[in-house]
Amino acid sequence: LNALHHGDEYHPVVFVDDNQQLQRSVINGLQVARPEDLEKLVPEHDITQVLLAVPSASPERRREIIDSLVGLPIHVRTVPTVSELLAGEASVNQIRDIDLDDLLGRDPVPPHPELIERCITNKVVMVTGAGGSIGSELCRQIVQSSPQELVLFDNSEYALYSIERELREIIQGMGLELELVALLGSVQDQNRLESVYRTFEVATVYHAAAYKHVPMVEYNIAEGVANNVFGTWYAAEAAHRAGVETFVLVSTDKAVRPTNIMGASKRLAEMILQGLAQQNSETRFCMVRFGNVLGSSGSVVPLFRQQIHDGGPVTVTHPEVSRYFMSIPEAAQLVLQASAMGTGGDVFVLDMGEPVRIVDLARRMIRLSGYDIDADAPATHRIDIEFIGLRPGEKLREELLLGSNETGTGHPMIMRAEEEYLPYNQVQRKLN
């Protein structure tokens, strides 16, 4: 409250708390009201924003609170969590939109530290595509698991610079001891990759470098295939020759019965690893397949937020289109854990929960931003949803499995898919 009073942007008018001992009391000059009074308080105090200051609440309780606010003409935002405040990662006046996990309605599963450590602790780890959405989050989590050295590999100078700077701040702030190396390069340069593996004696590779925007790859087929297919082939072959212990491909649900070039390129990348795994290689190859990640550069969430900020409309391809979703930290955490389970050629599939209709996600985001979607609402308080049609190669619904055979792994969120594969010599012939 004191932080809000120091600025001009916010004018606090009332507290709302479900603690009956606090209700009807006055704190710092503000009345403490009951949650059920909020609908009446909004017009009474001309409230335009509600700030959630419940950092210790359970995910279930947070969702209950957010659901109760969805229908009100207010913008719902949040303050940082206790853990972020204690770690110095945020300050109390850093108010932001609600967490993506709250939009999703998923409860994060506590990680199994022993799995994360198996491929990382005291090892030299390399991440390709280190500056991307998934790659950068893998790096953030890897540095906290005590690697001997982390090699960042990316073809984008700015992305590489940004993640290196961020990681050095994390390392310094947490007093971590590890070497950090940032290397510019392309996964399409096989000699460069093998040289890097050998020079730094890389033990574990997380291959996150890929073009993932479906429409972009659809219109840039040659580059998409060169990067996603041949880049994976070169990276994996170089790992095999250099004696890398573990090579993990970050894959996608779009690789299952693909209807677009991006999905087909990722399925070919999977087939390369499945084939290589049968070559008596010293390298343990595996792949982790999951759906969309909220907040990534290819996600609808940043697009929807920008469209809402601009006053709409919010564009959705089809009323029935649905996708599996997961937050970036959760996806990265599960990739690190799955990589420790592979024996060779494993296809791991993450439990993505129930698919989410994109139009429902759009409606929730619009309402939590304080706008209405009803046609009879005033134009100044309404954001329209516009259906623009499925894009070339786009499915209504995605799948995570090629067949129906899957087995558990001992981790509630990670399954092993039992799928057919082509012998490596046949894969090579197709690629050549």
Predicted features along the sequence, with ranges:
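A solvent-exposed beta-alpha-beta segment
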Residues: 1-87, 155-164, 181, 185
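Flexible, Lys/Arg-rich cytosolic regulatory linkers and terminal tails that connect or flank
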Residues: 23, 30, 35-36, 62-124, ...
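Proline-aspartate-enriched helix->loop->beta-strand connector
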Residues: 42, 46-49, 147-148, 197-206, ...
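NAD(P)-cofactor binding segment of oxidoreductase domains
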Residues: 63-79, 149-156, 198-199, 219-246
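Conserved Rossmann-fold NAD(P)-dependent oxidoreductase catalytic core, especially the SDR/UDP-sugar
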Residues: 88, 207, 211-270, 275
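N-terminal Rossmann/SDR dinucleotide-binding element
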Residues: 93-101, 105-201
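Strand-loop microenvironment adjacent to phosphate/nucleotide-handling motifs in alpha/beta enzyme folds
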Residues: 110, 117-119, 241, 275-293, ...
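Hydrophobic/aromatic anchor residues within beta-strands of the central parallel beta-sheet
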Residues: 182, 224, 285-288
